Amino acid sequence: MIYDVIIVGAGASGLFLGANLKGKKVAILEKNSSAGKKILASGGGRCNITNRFVSAKNYLGEQKFIEQILKILSPDQVLKFFSELKFSEQKQNQFFCDSGAKSVLGLLLKRQNADIFYNKEVLGAKKVDEIFEILTKDEKFRTRNLVIASGGLSYKALGASDVGYKIASEFGIELSPTTPALVV
């Protein structure tokens, strides 16, 4: 089978994308036995979902690109997606889920438009003609479009790995040096 889109990583970004890709055959490959481990840990288990004031200057990278992304997906649009959950605005205009991070993860899973494959650690990827081939320990997946949403290097105990960096390097994508960050 050839998927329209394969997403590597069932964290916040991968699950959010999978829930919003409609009308396509989508798969998510997750190396852990369950999705969203970092979601469950975020905000002390209360999941700080977004901030009221989000600006490109708060991010490292190409400012114009970041500005375009923030225009496409604003904090209000994120809150609208999660509108069936109740959020409280707290210190520094942060939004926390009143019913906890498990509710956020549950909603992301409920709204999935993707087949999620657990225990599928990605070992590498290559492009053959116009098709990406994604290799796991026991299976090969094929797709027309590949999204790397494997997260950063923090919280190795929750499944963090450098697979996204390796795949990006294999495809000649220039990477910025990683730096520690604190979300405020």
Regions found by a protein language model. Name each.
Residues 82, 108, 168:
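Residue-level signal for inorganic ion chemistry
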Residues 31:
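Short beta->alpha hinge that forms the Motif I/post-I loop of the SAM-binding pocket
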Residues 3-28:
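N-terminal Rossmann-like FAD-binding beta1-loop-alpha1 element of flavoenzymes
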Residues 66-74, 91-110, 117, 155-163, ...:
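Short beta-strand to alpha-helix junction loop
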Residues 34, 111-184:
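Predominantly flavin-linked oxidoreductase catalytic cores and closely associated redox partners
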Residues 35-41, 69-74, 85-95, 172-182:
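A short alpha-helix-loop-beta-strand transition element characteristic
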Residues 44-91:
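Glycine-rich active-site loop/strand segments that organize a redox cofactor
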Residues 8, 41, 148-149:
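Redox-cofactor binding/interface segments in oxidoreductases and associated redox assembly factors
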